[in-house]
Amino acid sequence: MPLDDEIVGEEEGAPETVPVPRSLVPHLSETAILLDIDGTLLELMPTPREVWVPPGLSKTLNRLLARTNGALALVSGRSLNDIDLIFAPEQYPAVGGHGAEMRIDPDNESVDSHAPPMDRELKRRLAAIAKLSPGILLEDKGYSLALHYRLAPHAEKAIYAAVSLIRADLPNAPIEILPGKCVCEIKHSGFTKATGVRELMTREPFKGRRPLFIGDDVTDETVFGIMPDYDGLAFSVGRRAQGVQGHFDSPSDVREFLSHLLDDERDAALP
């Protein structure tokens, strides 16, 4: 796999990524592990509800949570409720809704919310776009709305055109369009995964640790961009993104890497 002491590949037109000496990867007692879910920990599926947690992953996450003294968090566009449904019965610290909500302690029901739910009329207009073609799936995340077209790739241009028209009709609406892997997501502007991670890093047990973030999609690039502020490490999945120290080919490689973090006697060597 590409995460070793050699130079990994680079995105076309981007500068070469820098080799990652094993000695730079911090001990788990000094690390905050931050993980995207879809396309990073778990394989992408035709529909959001089809994702599943492979055997052994929850055990690995639980052990990492213990070894980092609680400094492990999932960072996702999904809501916290949705994250909990996927990993049930386990619950983890998490930044959900692209930074709209955050939970530090799974044993504490307190959830920090940073945005109101999306306007109902705006949501109704956006939801109508799903009727453009069979195969377009609507996912209401509360703080955002996603139009998945993995089953209708031909509808991509029509979806973005319709969203752009709605946005033009409502120029003052505080919304942002997030293009993803066969998904067009619309959310409140003013918060991102990066803003969520920044707040997370001010709170115990994450405060003062070096973050290690792994993500796969365009929305994860905001977090890649802030890792230098914390002397952190960033890795992409499935593509060679800019601003990362290396990449994994697939979620299975990510899961293997996380297992190796536990297997190595130093807790921090790359496989």
Regions found by a protein language model. Give the residues of each.
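Residue-level signal for inorganic ion chemistry
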Residues: G39, A94, L147, V197, ...
